[in-house]
From Swiss-Prot:
<comment type="function">
    <text>Involved in ubiquitin-mediated protein degradation. Regulatory factor in the ubiquitin/proteasome pathway that controls the turnover of proteasome substrates. Targets proteasomes to the nucleus and facilitates the degradation of nuclear proteins.</text>
</comment>
<dbReference type="InterPro" id="IPR013868">
    <property type="entry name" value="Cut8/Sts1_fam"/>
</dbReference>
<keyword id="KW-0539">Nucleus</keyword>
<dbReference type="GO" id="GO:0071630">
    <property type="term" value="P:nuclear protein quality control by the ubiquitin-proteasome system"/>
</dbReference>
<dbReference type="InterPro" id="IPR038422">
    <property type="entry name" value="Cut8/Sts1_sf"/>
</dbReference>
<dbReference type="Pfam" id="PF08559">
    <property type="entry name" value="Cut8"/>
</dbReference>
<dbReference type="GO" id="GO:0031965">
    <property type="term" value="C:nuclear membrane"/>
</dbReference>
<feature type="compositionally biased region" description="Low complexity">
    <location>
        <begin position="52"/>
        <end position="70"/>
    </location>
</feature>
<protein>
    <recommendedName>
        <fullName>Tethering factor for nuclear proteasome STS1</fullName>
    </recommendedName>
</protein>
<keyword id="KW-0813">Transport</keyword>
<comment type="subunit">
    <text>Binds the proteasome.</text>
</comment>
<dbReference type="GO" id="GO:0070628">
    <property type="term" value="F:proteasome binding"/>
</dbReference>
<feature type="compositionally biased region" description="Basic and acidic residues">
    <location>
        <begin position="38"/>
        <end position="50"/>
    </location>
</feature>
<dbReference type="GO" id="GO:0015031">
    <property type="term" value="P:protein transport"/>
</dbReference>
<comment type="similarity">
    <text>Belongs to the cut8/STS1 family.</text>
</comment>
<keyword id="KW-0653">Protein transport</keyword>
<keyword id="KW-0963">Cytoplasm</keyword>
Amino acid sequence: MNSLLATPPVPPHFYEHVRLSPSWSMSSANSSGNRKRKAEDDNPSDHDTRMSASPSNSPALAPRPLPTARQIKRPRPNISGRPLPLSRLLETLDTDALRSVLRSMCNRHPELETEVVHTAPRPSVSSALQVLSNYESTLQSSFPLGGNSSSDYAYNRVRQHITNLLDALNDFTPHFLPPNESQVSTALNYLDGATEILHRLPRWDTPQHNLEKDVAYEEIAKAWIVVIREAGKRGGGIQLQYGGWDLKLSKHNQTAGGKLQDAINVLSSSLCWMGGHQDSSASQGGDPTSIRHQLLSGTYGSSSPLKVSKW
């Protein structure tokens, strides 16, 4: 009776998924030990390393230079007064102040005068005439208002300014004469402008007051003679022949009251020697209808129409 009620035994295959048998565990361990190892088993993090590494064929980036640190001036612990640097001091000086400084330095140290002369740029005709024009403007503004502008009273008011202008004229004129000035055209242009300024000096009722202007005319006439003779030696005097200087000098002589007649005579003799002076228009090329004049002026053939023959 008990044998009939006893529970039948459970087959062994029902326990395969519940508990491993010792024989299966040992065989499983042995099979895993005999299995060939792969590279992934030795270095499990190699996959992460390869993923984080950059491709071998990617372009190499140039290293960026590190920005240089700016040199920041540290504030002085103790601030005190000090003189300006020379560069800042010169920036505050105007033309008159700078000229005064240079003049005083050259007076105290004469050896600096030569250095300043060689260092300063050579004055041009326009700059020299501008200086003379400034003296003339100062002279004109010094005349008394109203009254006779040629009286002795007016002369005494502007006498010093006349002296300053004539002194500057006497200093600039030799600078533009040969051999110091190698370009004849530059010398002629200066004399033309300087003579115009000299014409504008006033004439006074007292003849004695006009002596300074008359002496200045004599000096400027000598300067014209020097330049005219030098121009005749260069290029066959082409500048005198076709520059119109005979007409300009004749006009200056007429304005000066004949005080430049000596320069006119030298110019006439130079043009006659060169065979180019016929009348007052010789420097312009002679007869406007001549072929020579048309060739020099570039008008040859412009007055005559082009004739076309019939076919």
